[in-house]
Amino acid sequence: MGWLICFCVFAAIIIVALYLRKIHGFLVDDRAPPNLPSLPIIGSLLSINSNSPPHIFFQQLQKKYGDIYSLDMGSNRVIIVNNHHHAKEVLLRKGKIFAGRPRTVTTDILTRDGKDIAFGDYSATWKFHRKIVHGALCMFGEGTASIEKIICREASSMCEILTNLQSSAADLAPELTRAVTNVVCTLCFSSSYKRGDPEFEAMLKYSQGIVDTVAKDSLVDIFPWLQLFPNEDLRILRRCVSIRDKLLQKKYEEHKADFSDNIQRDLFDALLRAKNSSENNNTSTQDVGLTDDHLLMTVGDIFGAGVETTTTVLKWSILYLIHHPQVQRKIQEELDAKIGRDRHPQVNDRGNLPYLEATIREVLRIRPVSPLLIPHVALSDANIGEYTVQKGTRVIVNLWSLHHDEKEWKNPELFNPERFLNEEGNSLCCPSLSYLPFGAGVRVCLGEALAKLELFLFLSWILQRFTLEVPGGQPLPELQGKFRVVLQPQKYKVIARLRTGWEKSLQSQESESG
C-alpha cells in the first residue's frame, strides 16, 4: 500500500503543479503559439538579446517560428503578430477582446496611472473618455476651415524660413518640430510660438527628456520591483513629466477661468464643454470616473504623440525625396499642372494630387513611424488563428513585418510611390491589405485625420516652392533609422533651393499684399 500512497501523492503534486502553470500561462499547449526558450524569472530575455532593432529582430524570428509566436518578458507572456491576417483579427474582428493595455511603471508615470487614451486600459471610463475626445477632435478635424488655416499659417512660416536659408545646408528638424508643435498647441490651447520663446523651449526640453528616457526600454517595466532602487532614468522622467504637467495645468486653469459655452476656441474648450454637458445631462462623469486628470492627460497625449510622430514622418519624407529626386520632380510637375503659382495648395486639392498622396502613403509604408504598435492585452481567453491565447497575454503587432511582407509587396525595400496608383497613374489604389500605418479598430489612432492633413499641406507648400537637395559634395544620408519611441531617421542636412520663377512670383505676392 505504501507505493500506492506515494503514487497518489506524486500524482496530486503533478496535477497541482500543472494547474498552477496553466493559470499563469506557462503550460505547454499544442495549441499555443511557438514560444522562444524561457527561463524562470527572466523569461526569454536571453533569447532576445540582439543588436538589431526589435521590429527587425522579430521579423527575423518569423522565419524560424512562423507568422505568430510568443516570448516571455519576465513573467509576462507576449505574442508577436507578423502578418495582416492575424493583425486584423486582433485589431478588428476581436478588437474589444484585445483592447486592453498593459500597466507599466513608465506609462503610469506618463499618464497618471493610465488616465489617457493611448495607454489607458479598456473600461467604461475609457470608452466615455474616448467618445468625448473623438467628438472634440471632429470639430477641428479633416476638412474644417479652422485647422486648415492653422496648418497653412505654419506652412507659410516654414516656407519663409526656407527662403531665408536657401542655398545653405541646414538641419530642418528644429523648424519642422516648431511648425508641427504650433499646429498642435493652437489646436489644444490656442497658443503658438516663435523661435526662442522660453515656454516653447521648455516644452521641447521636457519632450526630449521624456523621449530619451522612455526610449531606453528600462528593465523596470519588466521587473517593477526595480523601482525600489535608485534609478536615474525614472528620476529624469518624473522631473520632465512634472514640468509638462505644470504647463498643462496652467493652460487648463486659464481655460476654466474664462470658459464660455458660446465660444469654443480650441480642444481644451471642447473637452470642457463635453464634460460639462455630460454632467448637466445627468450622465455622471463620476459613474465612469472621468476627472480633470483625464482631460489633462488627453491633451498630453495629443501633444506628445502628435508632435513626435508627424514631425518624424515629415523628416522621413524629405529624406526619401532627396534620395529620389525623380519622385520630387513628379510631385512638382503635378503641383504645377493642378495648382500653378498663383495660389497655395489647399485641402480641396488632395483629390487632384494623387502622386503626392501616393508618396505620403509609401513613406508611411516603408518607414512606419511606430514599427511596433503599442501592446494590446487579451481581456479574456481567446484565439488568434489556430492558437489559444490566455487572458492577460500581451499582443504586439509588428507593423514593420506587415509593411515589408514579400508575399504582399513587390520589392518591399524599394521606395516606389507608383505602387499606390492605378495603371494610368491618375488615381489612388490600395495594392495590399497589409497596410495599417495608424493601426485599426478600437485602438485606431485618433489623430489620423489631422496627421494626414498636416503631411499633405506641409509637403505640398514646401515642394511647390522649393527643390530639396543634398549639400554639394556630401553623401546621401543613410536610411536605416533609429528605434526609439518612434522610428527616427539619423540627423541629416538639406539644401532648399527656390525653384526657377518663384523669385518673381514671391515678389509679386509681396507687392500685392503690401
UniProtKB/Swiss-Prot annotation:
State the protein's purpose. Conversion of pregnenolone and progesterone to their 17-alpha-hydroxylated products and subsequently to dehydroepiandrosterone (DHEA) and androstenedione. Catalyzes both the 17-alpha-hydroxylation and the 17,20-lyase reaction.
Q: Which UniProt keywords apply?
A: Heme, Iron, Lipid metabolism, Lyase, Membrane, Metal-binding, Monooxygenase, Oxidoreductase, Steroidogenesis
Which leading EC class covers this enzyme? oxidoreductase
Q: What is the lineage of its organism?
A: Eukaryota, Metazoa, Chordata, Craniata, Vertebrata
Protein name, entry field: Steroid 17-alpha-hydroxylase/17,20 lyase
GO molecular function annotations of the record? heme binding; iron ion binding; lyase activity; steroid 17-alpha-monooxygenase activity
Which reaction(s) does its UniProt entry say it catalyses? a C21-steroid + reduced [NADPH--hemoprotein reductase] + O2 = a 17alpha-hydroxy-C21-steroid + oxidized [NADPH--hemoprotein reductase] + H2O + H(+); 17alpha-hydroxyprogesterone + reduced [NADPH--hemoprotein reductase] + O2 = androst-4-ene-3,17-dione + acetate + oxidized [NADPH--hemoprotein reductase] + H2O + 2 H(+); 17alpha-hydroxypregnenolone + reduced [NADPH--hemoprotein reductase] + O2 = 3beta-hydroxyandrost-5-en-17-one + acetate + oxidized [NADPH--hemoprotein reductase] + H2O + 2 H(+)
Cell location: Membrane
User: Which annotated residues bind heme?
Assistant: 445
Which family would the database say this protein is a member of?
Answer: Belongs to the cytochrome P450 family.
What EC number(s) is this enzyme filed under?
Answer: 1.14.14.19, 1.14.14.32
Domain of life, per UniProt, equals Eukaryota
Q: Which cofactor does it need?
A: heme
A Gene Ontology cellular-component term? membrane
Instruction: Say yes or no: keyword ATP-binding present.
Output: no
List the GO biological process terms.
Answer: hormone biosynthetic process; progesterone metabolic process; steroid biosynthetic process
Q: Which PANTHER family match?
A: CYTOCHROME P450, FAMILY 17, SUBFAMILY A, POLYPEPTIDE 1, STEROID 17-ALPHA-HYDROXYLASE/17,20 LYASE
Alphabetical list of Pfam families matching this protein? p450
The pathway to which it is assigned is: Lipid metabolism; steroid biosynthesis
Entry annotated with the keyword Lyase: yes
SUPFAM superfamilies registered for this protein in UniProt = Cytochrome P450
